[in-house]
UniProtKB/Swiss-Prot annotation:
Its job: One of the components of the core complex of photosystem II (PSII). It binds chlorophyll and helps catalyze the primary light-induced photochemical processes of PSII. PSII is a light-driven water:plastoquinone oxidoreductase, using light energy to abstract electrons from H(2)O, generating O(2) and a proton gradient subsequently used for ATP formation.
Gene: psbB
Subunit structure: PSII is composed of 1 copy each of membrane proteins PsbA, PsbB, PsbC, PsbD, PsbE, PsbF, PsbH, PsbI, PsbJ, PsbK, PsbL, PsbM, PsbT, PsbX, PsbY, PsbZ, Psb30/Ycf12, at least 3 peripheral proteins of the oxygen-evolving complex and a large number of cofactors. It forms dimeric complexes.
Subcellular location: Plastid, Chloroplast thylakoid membrane
Species this chain originates from: Carica papaya
Transmembrane domains' residue ranges: 21-36, 101-115, 140-156, 203-218, 237-252, 457-472
Source organism superkingdom: Eukaryota
Protein name: Photosystem II CP47 reaction center protein
Similarity remark: Belongs to the PsbB/PsbC family. PsbB subfamily.
Length: 508
């Protein structure tokens, strides 16, 4: 046929059988990728330390999505929450991966069958004998079926009525587990961080989809609307489908980047805004203050801070710190976290407690500045020592650790104090193993960052695709050069411009 690469999809125009075939093959490719990727991730995933080396630090992409839907066990005998299990059941990580691969194979065979047997009676209009699809009816069928699936997910899977529930955690990502969720029908259901909204919105949207599907199955579109929106043209279906996909991609890019109940931080890592706002730092200080109010010592209060909470309060877990072209997991960047060294408290020679100013998200380097409780600069690590007034040596800064591995240890020599002051810029201080993976020390993003970038990019691309195909279907007559009001029978090839009698071809 000699089609250019950007026109090859015209081969399935007016060929419903092969149009169906290529869509089934696409589903086979997607399901096959998902299953294969899951098996690859399971082969390289280390489940031994869910606190300091969780799935998002290891760069897992599909495991978090399985986990949030209720899969927690592996045929390898481990559970995502730690510990061992003896009977993981069919719906383990490997079971889901295998199901996708089997489904992919069946779709592959179905696609081949429909490609070979493309000329089926069901695709033909009995009045004309030509291939024809009743697109409004097909729209109604798809709307109804997707409504049933949506309702079923919300009413059965999420609520635990028939299914495991979903991943639910506390606001600080410490106690997450899979559990049934009751629908939230009040105003709280509109809070993106309330899991009950997931159940209620799927039930409501599914009900609406079922009703809308039945409507479109039982009511024919008015002729004027049918013609105006080109409802008989398959490119209209393409355009509106692309619109649905890019809209969904923009929405999930937002819920992933800003955080929501659908993207728990235990599975995808914290958001950048939790670092920007000192979210975990405030909670840590609140817990320490509560401990001190109960007459605990500083050491006791800091020792009760969960290592998991302290680890969230570390800039290396901020998804916005990874560069756009830095491939690899977070562990390949700053290393595998081994342990929390403890919270450093700096003091000058007058006994004032000093706080290291933390590095903002979009800085690669930042001056080491220590301020007192009133925000007044008391010490720093100067760029030019000759002009320094607040150097660690001049001010006599010391550091003492509370909680963690260095609990009760203090340092007064300036070199060590400066080392820990620099590290305190990055939040809580952790020992990181950079040797095992040959980590290069340059921060990487988490799957939260990759997902957002990928979906925002494709959403923009698909937005232009929607405009392109929408314009092609709405203005098809203009592009083809056919007057829509032309009633006369037009002989193809008689005119240079189709249907324009002023351009009759001259016989040479």
């Amino acid at each position: 046929m000699g089609l250019p690469w950007y026109r090859v999809h015209t081969v399935v125009l007016n060929d419903p059988g092969r149009l169906l075939s290529v869509h089934i093959m696409h589903t086979a490719l997607v399901a096959g990728w998902a299953g294969s990727m899951a098996l690859y991730e399971l082969a390289v995933f280390d489940p031994s330390d869910p606190v300091l080396d969780p799935m998002w630090r290891q760069g897992m992409f599909v495991i978090p999505f399985m986990t949030r839907l209720g899969i927690t066990n592996s045929w390898g005998g481990w559970s995502i929450t730690g510990g061992t299990i003896t009977n993981p059941g069919l719906w383990s990580y490997e079971g889901v991966a295998g199901a996708h691969i089997v489904f992919s194979g069946l779709c592959f065979l179905a696609a081949i069958w429909h490609w070979v047997y493309w000329d089926l009676e069901i695709f033909c209009d009995e009045r004309t004998g030509k291939p024809s699809l009743d697109l409004p009816k097909i729209f109604g069928i798809h709307l109804f079926l997707s409504g049933v699936a949506c309702f079923g997910f919300g009413a059965f899977h999420v609520t635990g009525l028939y299914g495991p529930g979903i991943w639910v955690s506390d606001p600080y990502g410490l106690t997450g587990k899979v559990q049934p969720v009751n629908p939230a029908w009040g105003v709280e259901g509109f809070d993106p961080f309330v899991p009950g909204g997931i159940a209620s919105h799927h039930i409501a949207a599914g009900t609406l989809g079922i009703l809308a599907g039945l409507f479109h199955l039982s009511v024919r579109p008015p002729q004027r609307l049918y013609k105006g929106l080109r409802m008989g043209n398959i490119e209209t279906v393409l355009s509106s489908s692309i619109a649905a996909v890019f809209f969904a991609a923009f929405v999930v890019a937002g819920t992933m980047w800003y955080g929501s109940a659908t993207t728990p931080i235990e599975l995808f890592g914290p958001t950048r805004y939790q670092w920007d706002q000192g979210y975990f730092q405030q909670e840590i200080y609140r817990r320490v203050s509560a401990g001190l109010a109960e007459n605990q010592s500083l050491s006791e209060a800091w020792s009760k801070i969960p290592e998991k909470l302290a680890f969230y309060d570390y800039i290396g877990n901020n998804p916005a710190k990874g560069g756009l072209f830095r491939a690899g997991s977070m562990d390949n960047g700053d290393g595998i976290a081994v342990g929390w060294l403890g919270h450093p408290i700096f003091r000058d020679k007058e006994g004032r407690e000093l706080f290291v100013r933390r590095m903002p998200t979009f800085f690669e380097t930042f001056p080491v500045v220590l301020v007192d409780g009133d925000g007044i600069v008391r010490a720093d690590v100067p760029f030019r020592r000759a002009e320094s007034k607040y150097s660690v040596e001049q001010v006599g800064v010391t550091v003492e650790f509370y909680g963690g591995e260095l609990n009760g240890v203090s340092y007064s020599d300036p070199a060590t104090v400066k080392k820990y002051a620099r590290r305190a810029q990055l939040g809580e201080i952790f020992e990181l193993d950079r040797a095992t993976l040959k980590s290069d020390g340059v921060f990487r993003s988490s799957p939260r960052g990759w997902f957002t970038f990928g979906h925002a990019s494709f959403a923009l691309l698909f937005f232009f695709g929607h405009i392109w195909h929408g314009a092609r279907t709405l203005f098809r007559d203009v592009f083809a050069g056919i007057d829509p009001d032309l009633d006369a029978q037009v002989e193809f090839g008689a005119f240079q411009k189709l249907g324009d009698p002023t351009t009759r071809r001259q016989v040479v």
